C-alpha cells in the first residue's frame, strides 16, 4: 500500500529484511506477501552458522514463497550466490525468477596504500575488520613470528560484541567436580597453577592468544582511510557474497591476507598472492614482506577498479531494470 500502484514493477532493496526480521511488521501492514510483479536485492547467504537470518530460513517462510510467484528478478552481489540461489529456485519450481549479479560499489576517490606508507609506519598492523561471516578467532591464532614488528589488531566496529571477547571475559573450568573461574588476564593466567596440567597449558595458551591482539572499538571514516593506507588487512571468511572489506582494500591497493573463498576469487582473481588455505599457510605468507608487496602490486596493476564505482553500478542496474520493465 506504500507504493504507487500505477508502477509496472515494485522494487525491494533489502529482500532479506522484508521477509525475515521485518516480516512481522510488513505482514501486519499488509505489504507482504507481494501479489504484484516485483524484484529486489538479496544480501545474505545460505550459511546457517551465524544467524537464523539466512536464505535457508527465508525460503521456509510462507510469505516469501507466495511472493516468489510474482517475482520477476532477484539481484545478488556475487556469481557464487547467484548459482546457489538459482539452484534453490529451480528446486522449488520458481525457475521463472531471473537472478542478476552486480558488483557492490564503493567510494573510489580515497587515500591509497603505498610501500612508503607501510615502511614508514611505526605501528604496522595486520587488522581483522568486522565479525559478520568471519572466523573472528583466527586472528588470535595467526602466528606472526617472534621477530615480527606487525601488531595483530581487531577493528571491531559497532554491534560486534558477539564476535569478539569482552574485556571482562571469564572462563569456568570444572575438574574433579570443582569449578574454578578465571578471567583472561595474562598476568593472572600465567601465574596460576592448576592441578590438571592439560587445563594448565590450555588456559595459558588462550591467555597468550588473547593478549596477542589489540582491539580497536571503532574509528572515524578518516581514521579508517588512514589505517587502510599503511597497514595490512586479514580476513578468515566462513561464507561471503559481497565482501565490503575486500572491495575497500581493492580500491585502496591495500594488501589483504584472506582465505580463497569463491566470492573473493571473483573480486581478486585466481592468482592473487595472499590467499591462504589454512592458518599455517597464512602465518608463513605474512612473515615474508615480498608476499605483501606482490599482493599490493597485483591489486594496483591487475584489477580494473571501474566496476567498483557508483556510476558503473548505477548504469548497469538501470539497464537491467529498463530491460525487465520492457519485457513485462
Report the location of each language-model feature.
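Active-site proximal beta-strand in glycosyltransferases
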Residues: 9-11, 28-52, 102
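Conserved donor-binding/catalytic core segment of Leloir-type glycosyltransferases
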Residues: 117-156
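Short hydrophobic beta-strand element within catalytic cores of glycosyltransferases
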Residues: 255-258
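Donor nucleotide-sugar binding/catalytic pocket of nucleotide-sugar-dependent glycosyltransferases
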Residues: 70-87, 91-113
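Nucleotide-activated donor-binding/catalytic signature segment of Leloir-type glycosyltransferases, i.e.
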Residues: 165-219
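Membrane-proximal helix-turn-helix segments that form the acceptor-binding/catalytic region
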Residues: 55-74, 201-206
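A charged, aromatic-enriched C-terminal amphipathic alpha-helix characteristic of glycosyltransferases
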Residues: 280, 290-328
Amino acid at each position: 500500500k506504500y507504493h504507487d500502484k500505477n508502477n509496472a514493477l515494485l522494487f525491494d532493496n533489502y529482500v532479506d529484511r522484508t521477509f525475515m526480521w521485518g516480516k512481522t511488521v510488513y505482514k501486519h501492514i499488509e505489504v507482504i506477501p507481494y501479489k504484484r510483479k516485483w524484484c529486489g536485492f538479496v544480501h545474505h547467504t545460505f550459511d546457517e552458522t551465524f544467524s537464523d537470518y539466512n536464505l535457508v530460513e527465508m525460503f521456509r517462510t510462507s510469505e516469501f514463497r507466495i511472493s516468489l510467484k510474482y517475482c520477476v528478478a532477484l539481484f545478488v552481489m556475487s556469481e557464487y550466490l547467484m548459482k546457489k540461489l538459482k539452484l534453490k529456485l529451480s528446486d522449488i519450481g520458481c525457475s521463472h525468477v531471473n537472478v542478476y549479479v552486480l558488483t557492490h560499489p564503493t567510494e573510489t576517490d580515497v587515500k591509497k596504500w603505498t610501500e612508503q606508507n607501510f615502511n614508514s609506519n611505526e605501528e604496522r598492523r595486520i587488522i581483522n575488520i568486522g565479525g559478520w561471516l568471519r572466523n573472528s578467532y583466527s586472528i588470535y591464532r595467526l602466528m606472526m613470528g617472534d621477530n615480527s614488528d606487525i601488531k595483530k589488531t581487531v577493528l571491531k566496529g559497532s554491534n560486534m560484541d558477539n564476535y569478539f571477547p569482552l574485556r571482562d571475559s571469564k572462563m569456568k573450568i570444572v575438574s574433579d567436580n570443582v569449578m574454578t573461574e578465571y578471567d583472561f588476564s595474562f598476568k593472572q593466567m600465567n601465574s596460576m597453577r592448576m592441578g590438571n596440567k592439560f587445563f594448565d597449558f590450555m588456559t595459558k595458551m588462550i591467555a597468550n592468544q588473547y593478549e596477542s591482539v589489540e582491539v580497536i572499538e571503532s574509528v572515524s571514516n578518516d581514521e579508517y582511510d588512514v589505517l587502510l593506507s599503511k597497514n595490512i588487512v586479514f580476513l578468515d571468511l566462513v561464507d561471503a557474497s559481497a565482501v565490503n572489506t575486500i572491495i575497500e582494500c581493492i580500491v585502496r591497493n591495500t594488501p589483504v591476507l584472506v582465505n580463497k573463498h569463491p566470492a573473493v576469487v571473483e573480486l581478486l582473481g585466481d592468482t592473487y598472492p595472499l590467499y591462504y588455505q589454512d592458518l599455517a599457510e597464512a602465518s608463513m605468507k605474512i612473515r615474508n614482506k615480498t608476499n605483501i608487496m606482490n599482493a599490493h602490486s597485483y591489486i594496483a596493476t591487475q584489477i580494473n577498479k571501474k566496476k567498483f564505482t557508483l556510476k558503473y553500478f548505477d548504469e548497469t542496474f538501470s539497464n537491467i531494470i529498463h530491460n525487465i520493465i520492457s519485457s513485462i
